[in-house]
Regions:
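Conserved AMP-binding/adenylation subdomain of ANL enzymes
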Residues: 342-360, 370-411, 425-427
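Conserved pre-ATP/AMP-binding loop-to-beta segment of ANL
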Residues: 156-158, 282, 293-323, 330, ...
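Conserved AMP-binding/adenylate-forming core of the ANL superfamily
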Residues: 94-97, 144, 160-215, 232-237, ...
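Adenylate-forming
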Residues: 205, 247-266, 287, 389-393, ...
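Structural core segment of the AMP-binding/adenylate-forming
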Residues: 3, 11-12, 21-25, 31, ...
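AMP-binding/adenylate-forming catalytic core of the ANL superfamily
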Residues: 202, 227-252, 267, 393, ...
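Conserved AMP-binding/adenylate-forming
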Residues: 439-566, 572-576, 589
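Conserved C-terminal "lid"/linker of ANL adenylate-forming enzymes
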Residues: 279, 603-609, 617-621, 637-712
Length: 712
């Protein structure tokens, strides 16, 4: 996977940060709103030193120390480092080097992972200013070429294992067959007139055909974009009409929750409303024949092409367009580059998840979520990617654990919400299934609460590395996440990722430790957007990330960087709770409230009222058979007061029939706040961005009733 003996190319000029690094000074206070117990300083898990020494990141550090000036310190024996503080200091030194000397660090990454520049770069970071940083000027390469190069060394090994709700055993697709299908499809795309810069769209589930189509698109230099087939026509058109695709790959339907879902009418509407389409390719998941005028998948991928032709492209050539949730307007069409994604995903998958040819990489996702794009990155490291098309909770809540067992997954990724659902269902996957192959469990989507950490170690596996991560569609990667050589502490993400100059800033732009602040990134990352589609002046891009702190990426999350270097995510800062001048994270409230067995899900909103008042209601979805009476309201208030603070106690607790989510499953807070403030539904939210628009009707009606009470 990696190569050694590479020396640093000449002419690199180190980039240094102009922003201060946060350090703990005498007099600093440590304040955390995340519940911790008295054993918080004792790790839940420590990697065995022998295991840590064999990780890719450990080998990378030693190699980078010899060739690129990285700090080198040997791993401490377990007995000499009971709390993991020495390991943390070792990683902190590596991280500090990675952000203080961006040129050397990213040169080391490209050397270690043998990135193949057909035209070498003239430098690393030509312009570090954000927005607009320019990486590896003059370089030419191809993402798909790197994703398929393991076909040379392991042609018969599985590149993809696929499962769905109807299969017991995974269906393999070998590296050689994956490369052949990509080559055949890429040749057909060229025959259709697709050239670099043309857009290729997909309305596909998480199936091998989607991976083939993405890689074929990248091979010819087209710009990929995708939506999951559970998106309705309006949601898809809000995205695809922005970029005007020339090709649409589309399924006839999908299977979820034990049911077939026909999408032929949706696909017909997409064809009518996307006038720039030159071709529609039919992928028959449900086995229906291709509609009139559509091309058949098998006809395009059946040619005996030995090796694809890879277009050699500038480093910043667009690879794909991802989309924001679009809850309050048209989704942002986020453009990321071939080279930027390649080097960032090699770093993230290869170093932070420690993926290699020995691994089977399963992350539960859909093609409408950035984690699908990141799942494909497993191919870059030679890992076998496991695709699963179906519900994680069918036929029972623990279905995803069964998929992991049947596929032999070594790295399993899921959402924090799924972990909590399994805990509430009383599952024991470690007892009931063979999960011996699983060495790492990743979680993302929302902060994983301490109870989720405990449940994984109690009920899944006591010796497993739990990599809670946080990043965003905006960079298709993680800002903070897992490190295989570090301990895991209750309720905390292990560390900032290499090359990511993550800090927590107060309102004055001062770095803080042990206090809640804004998540900022003070230096560029290669996978940051090259821009937004149809934003030629970059106005919307700047407004999205760089208005609060000019030249610094503000991500929109509240975080605490702890004195030991771990990170706690408190929720979105754009839905801030602010009582009596104290900022609070909604995630902390959800974690405490949803421990109660009577509460299935919750939503908290802070609303400034006329006359200077502040109203903070807590909305709860009750578990089956539960009743919101005075006793339960009292218990909710008591646990919030005792485990957080009196400020976290809501003004009212209100039962609701459901909580609204984005199409990728995240709670919607800002549109609910707008509704409660009196905005009309069509002004508060983009209807096509919500999983169940009916859940918002309750809040709309509540706002009317409150307005009537005030005027009455």
């Amino acid at each position: 996977m990696a190569r050694s003996g590479l020396s640093e190319p000449p002419g690199r000029v180190a980039a240094t940060s102009t922003h201060p690094r946060p350090t703990l000074r005498p007099g600093d206070t440590t304040v955390s709103t995340t519940p911790q117990d008295d054993t918080a300083t004792t790790p839940l898990w420590r990697p065995d030193p022998a295991r840590a020494a064999t990780t890719t990141i450990a080998a990378f550090q030693q190699w980078a120390a010899r060739h690129h000036g990285a700090p080198a310190e040997p791993l401490a024996p377990l007995a000499d480092d009971p709390d993991g503080s020495l390991a943390a200091a070792r990683y902190a030194a590596l991280h500090a080097w990675s952000v203080a000397d961006l040129d050397r660090f990213w040169t080391a990454v490209t050397g270690w992972f043998d990135v193949r520049f057909t035209t070498p770069p003239r430098g690393v970071l030509a312009d570090p200013a954000m927005p607009g940083a320019r990486w590896f000027p003059g370089a030419r390469l191809n993402y798909a070429e790197h994703a398929l190069r393991h076909a040379d060394t392991a042609p018969d090994a599985p590149a993809i294992l696929h499962l769905d709700e109807t299969t017991t055993d995974p269906r393999p697709l070998s590296w050689a067959e994956l490369r052949r299908q990509v080559g055949s499809l890429a040749a057909e795309l060229r025959r259709l007139g697709i050239r670099p810069g043309d857009r290729v769209s997909a309305y596909l589930p998480n199936i091998p055909e989607a991976v083939v189509a993405l890689l074929a698109s990248a091979a010819v230099g087209a710009v990929w974009t995708s939506c999951a087939p559970d998106f309705g026509a309006r949601s898809v058109l809000d995205r695809f009409q922005q970029i005007e695709p020339a090709v649409l790959f589309a399924v006839d339907g999908y299977r979820y929750g034990g049911k077939d879902h026909d999408r032929t009418e949706v696909v017909a509407e997409l064809r009518r409303e996307l006038p720039g389409l030159r071709a529609v390719v039919h992928v028959p998941v449900l086995g229906t024949p291709a509609p009139d005028g559509a091309l058949r998948w098998d006809d395009l991928t059946g040619h005996p092409v030995a090796r694809p032709e890879f277009e050699q492209l500038p480093f910043d050539h667009p690879l794909w367009v991802l989309y924001s949730s679009g809850t309050t307007g048209l989704p942002k069409a986020i453009v990321q580059s071939q080279g930027g994604i390649l080097v960032e995903h090699l770093k993230q998958a290869g170093l932070h998840l420690d993926l290699g040819p020995q691994d089977r990489f399963l992350w539960y996702t859909s093609t409408g979520w950035m984690m699908w794009n990141f799942l494909v990155a497993g191919l870059l490291t030679g890992s076998t990617v496991v695709t699963y098309d179906g519900s994680p909770g069918h036929p029972g809540t623990g279905a995803l654990w069964s998929v992991a067992a049947r596929s032999g997954a070594t790295v399993l990724g899921t959402s924090a919400a799924y972990v909590i659902a399994c805990r509430k269902a009383g599952l024991h996957p470690g007892r009931d299934l063979d999960l011996s192959a699983v060495r790492c469990i990743g979680t993302t989507g929302s902060p994983l609460p301490p109870d989720g950490f405990r449940w994984i170690y109690d009920e899944v596996k006591h010796d497993v590395w739990l990599a809670s991560v946080s990043g965003g569609t905006d960079v298709c990667s993680c800002f903070v996440g897992g490190v295989p050589t570090l301990p895991v502490h209750l309720g905390e993400i292990q560390a900032p990722c290499l090359g990511a100059d993550v800090q927590s800033w107060d309102a004055a732009g001062k770095p803080v430790i042990g206090q809640v602040g804004e998540l900022v990134v003070t230096q560029p990352l290669p996978s940051m957007p090259t821009g937004f589609w149809n934003d030629p002046e970059g106005t919307r891009y700047r407004e999205s990330y760089f208005e609060t702190f000019p030249g610094v990426w503000r991500h929109g999350d509240w975080i605490t960087v702890t004195p030991r270097g771990t990170v706690v995510i408190h929720g979105r800062s754009d839905s801030t709770l602010n009582r009596q001048g104290v900022r609070m994270g909604s995630a902390d409230i959800y974690e405490v409230v949803e421990r109660l067995p009577e509460i299935r899900e919750s939503l908290v909103i802070g609303l400034e009222e006329p006359g200077g008042g502040y109203w903070m209601p807590l909305f709860v979805v009750l578990s089956e058979g539960a009743r919101l009476d005075d006793a339960l309201r009292g218990r909710i208030r008591t646990v919030l007061r005792d485990q957080l603070s009196p400020r976290h106690v809501p003004d009212e607790v209100i039962a609701v029939p459901g909580i609204p989510h984005t199409l990728t499953g995240k709670r919607i807070e800002v549109p609910v706040k707008r509704l409660l403030a009196g905005a009309a539904l069509d002004q508060a939210v983009n209807p096509g961005s919500v999983d169940d628009l009916g859940t918002l009707r309750f809040f709309e009606q509540l706002a009317r009733e409150r307005a009537a009470d005030r005027t009455g």
